Amino acid sequence: MRRTSSIRDERIAVILRKTLDILKKHNMDADIIEYPRGERRSVDIVVNKRIIIKIGRDASEISREEIEDLKLASKMLDSAAVIISETYLNEDLEPGVVMDRSDISVMDPETLDLYLSNEKVAIYYKRGHFFVKINGVALHRKRIERMLSLGELAEMIGTSRKAVYEYEREAMDPSIETAQKLIELFGEEIVSRIDLHELTERYVYGYVNKILKIHAQEDPMLRKMYEMGIEAVKLKRTAPDIVGRIEDQKTALVIQRDRGDDNEMVEKIVNTIKICAKLGCEIYAVLSNRGIDREAKKKLEDNVTFVEREKLEHLLKNLVRR
């Protein structure tokens, strides 16, 4: 078992390095997140283009808790979420095709390279079906040039008038079979490229919006923040304990545990700084009565606001008033 785990860790390290090399090649500023150490974590890399990356050897091996964390973080920090792995269900991922794990986009390093090169990575898999990303403006123009009504085109490709209307609005995309019929009629010009941010917003953000109130009802701290007008979620597998937002103002809270040690608290803060430097959020470290080492605190004060736990509610009220 230990040998298997070691091999998996080695493969993950290779994928991580490949991913970082690709990001560097495309002049993207990225940071590795290293908390929690030696345990499963939901965030491995953050990128300044508002992208959160989880690395896995096989996308199916990533736990539900990590997936949930990744979804919550992406919504609260207004970022695209993507899993980079080599395989899914022990099958090699196909270059140029974006797969899906619980509504999060999955791709191999080669597809990430193509995507960042502005190549037409157009095929993606969601909820049991393959789709092709269509350029709605080009489709509309081609249809008008051919003097076809929405209904006429719908009949030609075997779909509904409403579906064609949604393709042109880019509110939905056709299946591979339907896309092939459109390409035969109008050419490759109507094919576009996926946008990781759009896919995350379309498939992940709606889910998070639905569960925000449920989470707030179950947790006293989140309920208090919700009543103040702060959308917030608790994260379990990464550095910040809570991330929240008031309109476009994003906030990360790192909360000191009564029985935790200073080193762990500092490590959480340092990794939260990395996340927020790339994704744009203010950081508040909430201290228990134990406090934190004076020297460590001094080194972090330029990037973090420290607040005593009993003053947290006052701080949150001030954030809402701003």
Task: Annotate each language-model stretch with its function.
Residues 1-34, 189-238:
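Acidic-basic catalytic patches of nuclease active cores, encompassing PD-(D/E)XK
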Residues 4-6, 78-80, 85-86, 92-132, ...:
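Charged, structured surface patches that assemble and position nucleic-acid processing machinery
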Residues 16, 21-24, 30, 41-82, ...:
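Conserved catalytic cores of phosphodiester-cleaving nucleases, focusing on short active-site segments
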Residues 46, 147-162:
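Short alpha-helical DNA-recognition segment
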Residues 139, 153-154, 164-167:
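Conserved hydrophobic/aromatic packing and binding residues within compact polymer-binding modules
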Residues 143, 154, 183:
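The alpha-helix within a helix-turn-helix
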Residues 158-173:
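Recognition helix of helix-turn-helix/homeodomain-like DNA-binding domains
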Residues 177-192:
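DNA major-groove recognition helix of helix-turn-helix/homeodomain DNA-binding modules
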